[in-house]
Regions:
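Extended hydrophobic
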Residues: 2-186, 193, 197-201
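Leucine-enriched alpha-helical scaffold segments used for protein-protein interaction
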Residues: 37-45, 135-293
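Accessible peptide chain termini
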Residues: 1-2, 293
Length: 293
């Protein structure tokens, strides 16, 4: 083992700055300056509050609020965070690449990575695993990314690196990106059955309960969300109420068609006929039932 004690002992007058997470009360104070719609969306995601305790991500929230106004759903904020992280990386990355072409490629690649990590039920991968994923991609741009492999964890802005192990900065960013990749599949319900259901026990792997809600706030994927939700309730007839309600935390009935609202109402009605659970007065579930009725 090489000792660096002698090297450090020769250094004098060193100055460093340590950036710590913000305390919860400080984060709340800053979030309170945002619009009511933004605050409501942040409240829906317990993991998002923890992410915003990191100063860099809190700055992204404020930049988004300043540039675009309120966020209509958490997906808009996650998309802004991902875009900003990639932009910052490309700005500081000093290798000669066509940066304007790389952003879209990097986004698609990290969505694929997140999807594969969810299938594997992992929140961390090795550099070898990452290289294998990238190497299997097709096209000239993918080969360019292989040649600039370190871009994906440069300064830990896109993927966070710790001793050669890589992960996303926050588990919900991984879940959001995985949901985007899932949403691109031709038959989402069939794909989800293949990757998320334990066939012998007819049991859905728990990590997908955090991925699936991100399908619900996109108008393009809301129909698939309702079908996926029906699939889950069919397999998990004794689903705990907390998990059941968590799946619905991002649902916006205004993005649903009449038949989708009717199907969702039927699922809600049947669930609360079976489960002796209290529905909070003027809470999100009661509002959802009213709007779907």
């Amino acid at each position: 083992v090489v000792s660096y004690a002698s090297i450090f002992s020769s250094c004098t007058k060193l100055v460093f700055v340590e950036v710590n997470r913000l305390e919860d009360r400080e984060v709340i104070k800053i979030i309170d300056t945002c619009s009511d719609v933004t605050k409501e969306n942040i409240t829906k995601s317990p993991k998002l509050r923890k992410l915003l305790s990191i100063p860099r991500y809190l700055m992204y929230l404020l930049e988004n609020e300043e540039q675009r106004g309120s966020i209509s759903n958490v997906g808009e904020l996650f998309e802004f965070i991902v875009d900003s992280s990639i932009d910052e990386t490309l700005k500081k990355y000093d290798k000669p690449i066509r940066k304007e072409n790389f952003k879209a490629l990097v986004k698609r690649v990290i969505e694929r990575i997140a999807f594969i990590m969810e299938i594997s039920r992992k929140d961390k991968i090795s550099k070898d695993d990452l290289y294998t994923i990238i190497d299997e991609l097709k096209g000239n741009m993918a080969h360019m990314l292989v040649a600039n492999f370190d871009l994906l964890f440069f300064e830990s802005r896109i993927l966070k690196e710790t001793n050669g192990i890589l992960q996303f900065g926050n588990s919900e960013i991984q879940e959001y990106l995985a949901a985007k990749e899932l949403g691109r599949q031709d038959n989402i319900e069939s794909v989800l059955y293949d990757v998320a259901v334990q066939k012998e026990l007819k049991h859905i792997y728990p990590n997908w309960y955090d991925v699936i809600p991100h399908l619900s706030y996109s108008k393009d994927r809301s129909d698939s969300f309702v079908n996926v939700f029906k699939l889950i309730t069919a397999y998990e007839s004794h689903l705990e109420n907390e998990t059941f309600e968590s799946l619905l935390r991002y649902v916006n009935p205004s993005t649903l068609g009449a038949q989708q609202r009717a199907d969702l109402f039927s699922n809600l009605f049947e669930h609360y006929q079976r489960v002796p659970a209290y529905i909070k007065w003027r809470g999100p579930i009661e509002n959802l039932i009213q709007e779907c009725y």
